[in-house]
Amino acid sequence: FSDEVTNKKFIKKNKKFLGYYSFSNFKKRIYYLFNNILIWKYRKKSSSFIFRYYRLLNFQDFPIKMKSNKKKFSFKNFLIKLYVRLLSINFILFLIKKILNNKYFLNKDVSVYLKKINPDLVIYPTNAFEPLVSEIPIICKLYKTKSFFLIDNWDNLSSKSILINHPDYISVWGKQTANHANKIQNIPQKEILIGGTPRYDIFFKKEI
């Protein structure tokens, strides 16, 4: 589990619990900036990407007039526009991905846990945006383990960013999200499973 979870006392009661993983604020920032580059680079894949980009700029230059998007110079926005355009150049983007995928940059906590238990499959629930989502597929390949993502919400694959590394398999809510996985994230259909969501299971129980 991430060290940011809230119910740690309950988690520690599980005898199979191995421990937490963590990310430094610096590394979180790196992935945040990289995701901003990706939403600009692949903005034509989803209208939600370009909306997220404008939100990053406080809706400056947004096509629809809003109180917060009046034409005024913002040095912060200027820097954002500059770095997303410059770093989204194919060659530079390739180099950044190479660095992020380097085994010396990967999460050490997760690597230690996988080496210790040597699993056949790693099942990872995700919103498709946090730093570890980019590292799990690479770490699993290093230890010759299959990776399986459980996507947390119906719009995560169309509204967050682009997955720079694909898992071996991915489970989604329904047909719409399966289409997002294939068309937006370029995940082959044979690797996409429609698993639904456990959030609604309680409504089908006789007693609530």
Task: Provide a role label for each language-model segment.
Residues 1-4, 23, 125-128, 152, ...:
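Structural motif
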Residues 1-110:
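Conserved N-terminal ligand/cofactor-binding loop architecture of enzyme catalytic domains
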Residues 101-103, 151, 165-208:
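A nucleotide-sugar donor-handling region in carbohydrate enzymes
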Residues 121, 125-126, 134-153:
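Active-site proximal beta-strand in glycosyltransferases
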Residues 97-102, 124-127, 147-150, 207:
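Short, flexible loop segments at the rims of nucleotide/cofactor-binding pockets, characterized by
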Residues 4-10, 131, 177-181, 203:
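Short, charged/polar "capping" segments at the starts of alpha-helices
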Residues 109-112, 157-169:
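Membrane-proximal helix-turn-helix segments that form the acceptor-binding/catalytic region
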Residues 111-130:
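Short N-terminal targeting/anchoring amphipathic segment
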